[in-house]
Amino acid sequence: MAAEKRVFLDISVDENLIGRIEIRLFVEDAPKTCENFRALCTGEVGMTPNNKARLHYKQNEFHRIVKKFMIQGGDITEGDGRGGFSIYGRYFDDEKFKLKHSRPYLLSMANKGPNSNSSQFFITTAAAPHCNGKHVVFGEVVKGQNVVDYIDNLAVDDKSKPLAKVLISNCGELVKKKKPLKTDEELAAALEEKNNNARDNEIPKCPKSWLYRDDDNEKKHEMRNDKRREYRSRRSRSRSHEKNRDYKKENRGDSSRSQPRRDENGITVRGRGGVRFRRERSATPEHWRRNAPTKWVHDSHKHPEEDLV
């Protein structure tokens, strides 16, 4: 969406200022035509190529007034309707004939035929359907309609030229002003007033986060927590029982456990079970005796001469 643009025309009659006309340009519908008119209001382009005239509406006349139809001006080269010059050259082409001349106070381009737009324009003072499809509508008067009506009621000659001298004494582009920044004291006072006027119903509710749980989920969550607490309680009790058992084992006064076990011969016995063997040397079993060798092995390997020594 194109930014809205507005221009103004200060009008004087016989060197007496009568008021200002403010015009809103239809930039979206006719951007090229609007830019031509805006630049001619500001005079930013400079002079025509032959330096004959300045590309500016300032001190330009409304040279034609047709009662109950329109007021016409913008001839920056001749001043009588025979000239004109655009910021694009002598002429430029027509844009879309989208908007109709359906009411008064519409801004439209004057021309000499198709694609002959220059700097001349007119403002309607009544509906003009016969201009549809021939002239491009590109703006409307938003303030100063009474000034347009005043010009429309001026006396004219037989060629529709006003008898009084109607001039554009000044013109330009309107720029929307930014609001001035407040001082620190004003900002503090405004903030304090805003806080004092705050109401409970104006405070927005806290948004639901991903941690939010509705009633059903909250009940399930509580049940899970109860189970966890019960499990932890049982586990804690079992651990306390184990600690108590270990403590009793370590501190009970049992003489049988405080002294090592010994057998009948006084030898220390390890382990918990009873003794299953005898520690003293027993007699060699008979079957071992029968199978015992009668001659030692190392004696059989002696040299025969060793016995003679």
Curated annotation (Swiss-Prot):
What single Pfam family name could you report for this chain, choosing any that match? Answer: Pro_isomerase
Parts forming coiled coils: none
Look up keyword Transcription and say if it applies. no
MF (Gene Ontology): cyclosporin A binding; peptidyl-prolyl cis-trans isomerase activity
Does the keyword field hold Endoplasmic reticulum? no
Q: In which tissues is it expressed?
A: Co-expressed with pdi-1 in the syncytial hypodermis.
Q: What Enzyme Commission number(s) does the record list for this chain?
A: 5.2.1.8
Q: Which GO BP terms apply? A: extracellular matrix organization; protein folding
Residues covered by region (Disordered): 217-309
Q: Which GO terms describe its cellular component?
A: cytoplasm; cytosol
Q: Which reaction does it catalyse?
A: [protein]-peptidylproline (omega=180) = [protein]-peptidylproline (omega=0)
Kindly report, in one word, the top-level EC class recorded for this enzyme.
isomerase
Comp. bias regions, Basic and acidic residues = 217-229, 239-265, 280-289, 296-309
The protein's role, per its UniProt record: PPIases accelerate the folding of proteins. It catalyzes the cis-trans isomerization of proline imidic peptide bonds in oligopeptides. Thought to function as a catalyst in the folding and modification of cuticle collagens.
As for family, the record states: Belongs to the cyclophilin-type PPIase family.
- UniProt-recorded name of the protein: Peptidyl-prolyl cis-trans isomerase 9
Organism (species): Caenorhabditis elegans
